Amino acid sequence: MQKLVILGSTGSIGKSTLSVVDNNPEQYQVFALVGGKNVELITEQCQQYQPRFVALDDEQAAAKLKENLTALGLKIEVLAGQKAIYELASHPEVDMVMAAIVGAAGLLPTLSAVQAGKKVLLANKESLVTCGQIFIDEARKSGAKLLPVDSEHNAIFQSLPPEAQEKVGFCPLAELGVSKIILTGSGGPFCTKPLNEFSQITPAQAVAHPNWSMGKKISVDSATMMNKGLEYIEARWLFNASADEMEIIIHPQSIIHSMVRYIDGSVIAQMGNPDMRTPIAHTMAYPNRIYAGVAPLDFFKLKELTFIEPDFARYPNLKLAIEAFAEGQYATTAMNAANEIAVEAFLNDQIRFTDIVEVNRQVVENIAPVQVKEIADVLHIDKLAREVAKQHILQF
């Protein structure tokens, strides 16, 4: 029985992880649940899974949760604040940590799990986007096992040779016969929408993804393809890939989740219905396989598989992310922080859809280049970039 901590249990990935646990109750025990402010849902999760610990970042929410659990007669220890979350992520009894807190808020808890040498199921993009080198170095030092949960990175991982899977972050792609990492993306809900209509896109339209069930922030990132930009940055770090070893393809059906091209002409792809329980189950059971509750792919119902070259005029955020990686860790950190603020402003009807990339670009251009050597540098840039982004938003 493996003990599992879920960082972000009330989010989309967290709920899918619990669904996989439901299908394999004899293999996994939920040791701790970690959430933000959704007291109602995490109360229900505590009733069902009865973890030993539950932690909320918000102290008032934690106090309310404690009342709820006491009223239900549940003897679950309720913790509050970041320090408690770090301690749960690195608890000596824990076997694996699902790192699924969205945004920069998930950075330090995930790092805590890595430094403790845990099996880390990495669903938090920002960990690598903001401090990729630090994460890879810490994982090598502690012996932590990094397993990518993002459907694209998980697909790449599955399509790589076993030697590469054992060297996440430092695998020698060329020596293993790999010529290209091919990152696929659906293109989002506006793949064919006329560009002159982009400024009228509403938050409700942007969060309605055609293939995947995701949270609001990630859905908007998919619509702007910032999601793919962040995944490009992640892939560069996870698979030790150069710019020349990366390729991005728009694949609207989201059936092929990513591919690896080899020097002998072979292309190995991972396919399946678009359901996050597949990569989650893969990382939880690796190197074995477990039932995920996902319907098998029916090839006879597939009408077509199409592939389109990315159009940077349609997806300027994707271009910005690629350029930011070339600039360095400070630029990707600043861009990520700006994007979180810009997407929130868009969802609150403060700026237009087309303004998101303008905020991101302005912040990246106005943050002075600095060398990122430690987490404190990352947190400083992140804070500064958020302040600059908020100032730019006031001008719209």
Curated annotation (Swiss-Prot):
What reaction is this protein's catalytic activity?
2-C-methyl-D-erythritol 4-phosphate + NADP(+) = 1-deoxy-D-xylulose 5-phosphate + NADPH + H(+)
Residues reported in the UniProt entry to bind Mn(2+) = D150, E152, E231
Q: Which SUPFAM superfamilies match?
A: 1-deoxy-D-xylulose-5-phosphate reductoisomerase, C-terminal domain (SSF69055), Glyceraldehyde-3-phosphate dehydrogenase-like, C-terminal domain (SSF55347), NAD(P)-binding Rossmann-fold domains (SSF51735)
Matching InterPro entries: DXP_reductoisomerase, DXP_reductoisomerase_C, DXP_reductoisomerase_N, DXPR_C, DXPR_C_sf, NAD(P)-bd_dom_sf
Q: Which GO terms describe its biological process?
A: isopentenyl diphosphate biosynthetic process, methylerythritol 4-phosphate pathway involved in terpenoid biosynthetic process
Q: Which residues bind NADPH?
A: T10, G11, S12, I13, G36, K37, N38, N124, E126, G215
Q: What is its EC number?
A: 1.1.1.267
Keywords attached to this entry? Isoprene biosynthesis, Manganese, Metal-binding, NADP, Oxidoreductase
Q: What does this protein do?
A: Catalyzes the NADPH-dependent rearrangement and reduction of 1-deoxy-D-xylulose-5-phosphate (DXP) to 2-C-methyl-D-erythritol 4-phosphate (MEP).
Task: Report the NCBIfam families cross-referenced here.
Answer: Dxr (TIGR00243), PRK05447.1-1 (NF003938), PRK12464.1 (NF009114)
The protein here is known as: 1-deoxy-D-xylulose 5-phosphate reductoisomerase
What is the native source organism of this protein? Glaesserella parasuis serovar 5 (strain SH0165) (Haemophilus parasuis)
